């Protein structure tokens, strides 16, 4: 694992088929959602996921899903990203490389011995015993400790060793949604303050990952402030930030006060519906290119006063100054987006419920999206010149998230406002037959492969 040692660096972008090297491009902290992605942070779920699926609602999930299949889907997604020349930094790989002292400190913070039912127990003796165990732990067991967050509830007994225990775990089953624990603005990385207490420890792991990569975060949201990465979208010379179920005004205020957005215009998109299925901005709005975006139909067609009707507040400052001032308030979000020159592709309800809107843009008019969407949506995307790589994520999406939620983009190509997407549009105007086909493990299928294939967004069986 190589550290990203400079804020701005260059890397050699490799074509999807690996056949031709393209020209060296400047990579920076993301300025625009549609710029070519270079580095992404991800976490393939493992044992920590199981506790979440045995009571999905309590785990912040939508339905039960198979842990092993979910992990295989995730590995397939990573393979598809890497096939596009993107460097994927994996949380587990980083934890296997960080300094042992840092890892042990993180484990020390989460391993608990509960002696509340033993009032006569010597607390100092218990703590010394806990430290002794931690000091003996192997690296892999320290990682297990960090991911499973165990508590040992002790009680006395006259049998055997004199102790017995209940073992309680609070595993980080949502860690694979690496979009949420932080956001990456043109200024750098901000560590979030999660809306859910059970997700709060995830931020410490992500913070450690950044430091190991040489990307020390510039700030952390604290106190009553709430901020989650799914609510943030960089859009060229503006920042879009959702305010609703998971992000609040105080979190946004802290960012503006710290000059953490890196843009002179901040658009606060207000969610009045507060619905779990649309918990973040990226679940009902997303950007494909500088003049093309998507929005779920219920938001796009909503009338003023309806819960689905999004409004936005626009904060601005004079370039070169720090203080933002409220410029416009309660503006219709759809009108604002169209006024900035965006064509909006509608996402109908059936596709929305299959997480069609939660795609990842990896280059102008080139997205990674959940397979199995309607032919109508696929046609709309083709007509707009969008190159879609359809990903099999049938299990993982039952965690209330998809391709965008599972990625934290660390670096993208530098944004150049003068680039016209017309050439990109003509290159990507693909027919249904020319869309790529993939095996279930995410590798590209060839004409000789048989069995279940993901082709044009749908599962087909080749005999």
Name what the model sees in each region.
Residues 239-240, 445, 460-461:
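Short, isolated positions in well-ordered beta-strands
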Residues 444-451:
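Conserved beta-loop-beta connector loops within the AMP-binding
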Residues 370, 406, 447, 462-463:
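Short capping micro-motif at the N-terminus of alpha-helices
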Residues 403, 432-433, 449:
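First exposed extracellular module after export/assembly in secreted or surface-exposed proteins
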Residues 420, 452-463:
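C-terminal tail/sorting-segment detector
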Residues 22-418:
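The feature marks the mature, well-folded catalytic cores of soluble enzymes
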């Amino acid at each position: 694992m190589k550290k990203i040692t400079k804020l701005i660096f260059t890397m050699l972008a490799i074509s999807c088929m690996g056949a031709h090297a393209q020209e060296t491009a400047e990579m920076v902290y993301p300025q625009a959602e549609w710029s070519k992605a270079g580095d992404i942070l991800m976490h393939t779920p493992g044992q920590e996921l199981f506790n979440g699926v045995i009571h999905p609602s309590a785990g912040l999930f939508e339905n039960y899903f198979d842990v092993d299949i979910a992990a295989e889907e995730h590995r397939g997604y990573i393979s598809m990203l890497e096939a596009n020349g993107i460097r994927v930094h994996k949380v587990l790989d980083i934890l296997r490389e960080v300094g042992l002292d840092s890892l042990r400190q993180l484990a020390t913070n989460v391993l608990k011995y509960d002696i509340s039912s033993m009032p006569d127990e010597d607390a100092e003796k218990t703590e010394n015993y806990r430290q002794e165990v931690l000091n003996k732990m192997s690296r892999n067991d320290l990682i297990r400790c960090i991911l499973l967050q165990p508590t040992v509830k002790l009680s006395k007994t006259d049998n055997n060793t004199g102790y017995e225990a209940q073992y309680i775990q609070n595993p980080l089953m949502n860690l694979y949604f690496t979009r949420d624990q932080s956001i990456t603005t043109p200024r750098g990385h901000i560590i979030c303050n999660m809306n859910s207490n059970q997700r709060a420890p995830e931020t410490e792991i992500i913070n450690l990952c950044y430091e190991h990569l040489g990307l020390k975060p510039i700030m952390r949201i604290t106190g009553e402030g709430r901020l989650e990465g799914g609510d943030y979208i960089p859009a060229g010379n503006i920042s879009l930030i959702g305010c609703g179920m998971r992000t609040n005004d105080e979190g946004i205020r802290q960012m503006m006060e710290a000059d953490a957005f890196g843009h002179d215009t901040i658009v606060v998109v207000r969610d009045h519906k507060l619905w779990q299925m649309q918990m973040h901005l990226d679940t009902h709005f997303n950007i494909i290119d500088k003049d093309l975006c998507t929005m779920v139909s219920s938001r796009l067609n909503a009338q003023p006063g309806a819960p689905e009707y999004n409004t936005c507040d626009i904060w601005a400052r004079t370039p070169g100054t720090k203080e933002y001032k409220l410029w416009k308030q309660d503006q219709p979000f759809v009108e604002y987006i169209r006024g900035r020159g965006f064509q909006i592709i509608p996402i109908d309800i059936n596709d929305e419920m299959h997480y069609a809107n939660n795609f990842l843009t990896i280059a102008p008019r080139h997205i990674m999206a959940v397979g199995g969407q309607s032919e109508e949506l696929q046609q709309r995307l083709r007509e707009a010149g969008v190159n879609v790589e359809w990903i099999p994520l049938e299990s993982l999406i039952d965690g209330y998230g998809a391709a965008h939620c599972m990625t934290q983009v660390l670096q993208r190509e530098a944004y150049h406002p003068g680039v016209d997407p017309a050439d990109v549009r003509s290159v990507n105007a693909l027919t249904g037959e020319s869309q790529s086909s993939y095996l279930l493990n995410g590798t590209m299928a060839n004409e000789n492969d048989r069995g279940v294939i993901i082709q044009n967004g749908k599962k087909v069986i080749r005999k």
